[in-house]
From Swiss-Prot:
One of its GO terms (cellular component) is extracellular region. Residues 21-43 are annotated as: Framework-1. The gene is IGKV3D-20. This is Immunoglobulin kappa variable 3D-20. It is found in: Secreted; Cell membrane. InterPro entries: Ig-like_dom, Ig-like_dom_sf, Ig-like_fold, Ig_sub, Ig_V-set, IgV_Light_Chain. It comes from Homo sapiens (Human). Residues 1-20 form the signal peptide.
């Protein structure tokens, strides 16, 4: 039986917006999952965010963040279709349908004012 691996997840990320600070709270803080399982990561905003301005990133140690999803649900170039984004308003979700070993990383949601 495989030993569960840790999928790290940042709790809080805030970025200023023209309408004031929007606080993004991610949950859960960590997920203990194994390859082949499904991961669901949530991002809640303190005020409504246009779906056109919500992105998800993956970051591995020593590397720059990699854009996965933009406009809440659009996959960036080269991102496998096991990654999907959904949501609107104040509640957004990143789903990884079947975890691969290379998916174990830190994930961030970001509200932005124009294309990421």
């Amino acid at each position: 039986m495989e030993t569960p691996a840790q999928l790290l997840f940042l709790l809080l990320l805030w970025l200023p917006d023209t309408t004031g600070e929007i606080v993004l709270t991610q949950s859960p803080a960590t997920l203990s999952l194994s390859p082949g399982e499904r991961a669901t990561l949530s991002c809640g905003a303190s005020q409504s965010v246009s779906s056109s301005y919500l992105a998800w990133y993956q970051q591995k140690p020593g590397l720059a963040p990699r854009l996965l999803i933009y406009d809440a649900s659009s996959r960036a170039t080269g991102i496998p279709d096991r990654f999907s984004g959904s949501g609107s308003g104040t509640d957004f979700t990143l789903t990884i349908s079947r975890l691969e070993p290379e998916d174990f990383a830190v994930y961030y949601c970001q509200q932005y004012g124009s294309s990421p």
